[in-house]
C-alpha cells in the first residue's frame, strides 16, 4: 500500500527513508493552529489536520502520516524561532532546565478514512550555557526551523545533557509508536 508523509520536515523524511520505506511526500500546507490547550491534544490536533488534508486530496488508496512537534517548558509552548533574537531567548530559557518535547502523529487510511491519532512525550535537559555558546550554536543555523531552536541530531547534540524517553520523538517522529500503530491498527508491517 502506498505510504504518504504529510510533512515538509526533512528530518521526518530522513527518518522514514532510514527505515527503507518507499513513500511519497505531499505537504499539507494547513495553518498550524489549534484551539486545544493541552500539549498532547494540541499536537494530535495539528497532526490530524495535516494528515486529513492530504488524505482528502488523494484519489488512490494510501496510508497518510501526519506529525507535529512542539517544545513545552513550564506550560509555555515554544515553536520555531522567527529570528536570531527569538532563538537566543528560547535557548536561554531552556538551558540548565528540563523541558518536554511532544509529537503528535495521525495515520489516515484513505480507503475508509479510518484514522488513529496518538502522541509521544520526551523530557530533555539542556546544559547550562554561556551566552557566547548560545550565539555560536544559533549561528550554525540548524535550529531555525525546529521547535525550541535546537536540533538534537546535529550540532545541538552538544548542548543536550540528557533525555528521558524516545530520541526519535525529539527529532520529530516517534518511530516506535508509528510502527506499532501501523501494525496494530492498519495491518501495515514494516518488518
Swiss-Prot record:
One Gene Ontology CC term in the entry: cytoplasm
Lineage summary: Bacteria, Bacillati, Bacillota, Clostridia, Thermoanaerobacterales
Gene Ontology biological-process annotations: nucleotide metabolic process
The species this protein was found in: Thermoanaerobacter pseudethanolicus (strain ATCC 33223 / 39E)
Top-level division of the source organism's lineage: Bacteria
Active site: 68 (proton acceptor)
SUPFAM superfamilies, A to Z: ITPase-like
Molecular function, one GO term: UTP diphosphatase activity
Function: Nucleoside triphosphate pyrophosphatase that hydrolyzes dTTP and UTP. May have a dual role in cell division arrest and in preventing the incorporation of modified nucleotides into cellular nucleic acids.
Record localization: Cytoplasm
The protein, known as: dTTP/UTP pyrophosphatase
Amino acid at each position: 500500500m502506498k505510504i504518504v508523509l504529510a510533512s515538509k520536515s526533512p528530518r521526518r523524511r530522513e527518518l522514514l527513508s532510514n527505515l527503507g520505506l518507499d513513500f511519497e511526500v505531499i505537504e499539507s500546507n494547513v495553518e498550524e493552529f489549534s484551539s486545544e490547550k493541552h500539549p498532547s491534544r494540541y499536537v494530535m490536533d495539528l497532526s490530524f489536520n495535516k494528515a486529513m488534508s492530504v488524505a482528502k486530496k488523494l484519489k488512490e488508496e494510501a496510508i497518510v502520516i501526519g506529525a507535529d512537534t512542539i517544545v513545552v517548558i513550564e506550560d509555555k509552548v515554544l515553536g520555531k524561532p522567527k529570528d536570531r533574537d527569538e532563538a537566543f531567548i528560547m535557548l536561554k530559557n531552556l538551558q540548565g532546565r528540563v523541558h518536554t518535547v511532544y509529537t503528535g502523529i495521525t495515520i489516515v487510511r484513505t480507503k475508509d478514512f479510518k484514522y488513529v491519532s496518538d502522541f509521544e512525550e520526551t523530557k530533555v535537559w539542556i546544559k547550562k550555557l554561556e551566552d557566547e555558546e548560545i550565539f555560536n550554536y544559533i549561528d550554525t543555523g540548524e535550529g531555525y526551523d525546529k521547535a525550541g531552536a535546537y536540533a538534537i541530531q546535529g550540532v545541538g547534540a552538544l548542548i543536550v545533557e540528557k533525555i528521558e524517553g524516545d530520541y526519535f520523538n525529539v527529532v520529530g517522529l516517534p518511530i516506535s509508536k508509528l510502527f506499532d500503530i501501523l501494525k496494530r491498527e492498519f495491518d501495515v508491517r514494516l518488518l
